[in-house]
Amino acid sequence: RRINNDCQNFIGNRAMYEKVDWICKDCANIFRQDGLLNNCRSNCFYNTEFLWCIDATENTRNKEQLEQWAAILGAGWN
């Protein structure tokens, strides 16, 4: 299991992290592009690849919730 060191609030939010990370894993499995998984996870999911993967994995109905979870996990980015 890979722990994303970019996510400052991973501890105590493991279930939330796993749901957000699943988007990146699923996207990487679908497209099989080198670096996609790491790019999706970069900056604790605060990036355009993560947003693209939400759409690509047909999770747009959950987009707002996923973005909120990513923001919670990466609180302190700014």
UniProtKB/Swiss-Prot annotation:
Gene3D superfamilies: Crustacean CHH/MIH/GIH neurohormone. It is found in: Secreted. Belongs to the arthropod CHH/MIH/GIH/VIH hormone family. PANTHER family: ION TRANSPORT PEPTIDE, ISOFORM C. Coiled coil: none annotated. Disulfide bonds join 7-44, 24-40, 27-53. It comes from the Eukaryota. GO terms for cellular component: extracellular region. One of its GO terms (molecular function) is neuropeptide hormone activity. InterPro entries: Crust_neurhormone_CS, Crust_neurohorm, Crust_neurohorm_sf, Hyperglycemic, Hyperglycemic2. This is Mandibular organ-inhibiting hormone 2. One of its GO terms (biological process) is neuropeptide signaling pathway. Keywords: Disulfide bond, Hormone, Neuropeptide, Secreted. Produced by the medulla terminalis X-organ in the eyestalks and transported to the sinus gland where it is stored and released. Represses the synthesis of methyl farnesoate, the precursor of insect juvenile hormone III in the mandibular organ. Pfam families: Crust_neurohorm (PF01147).
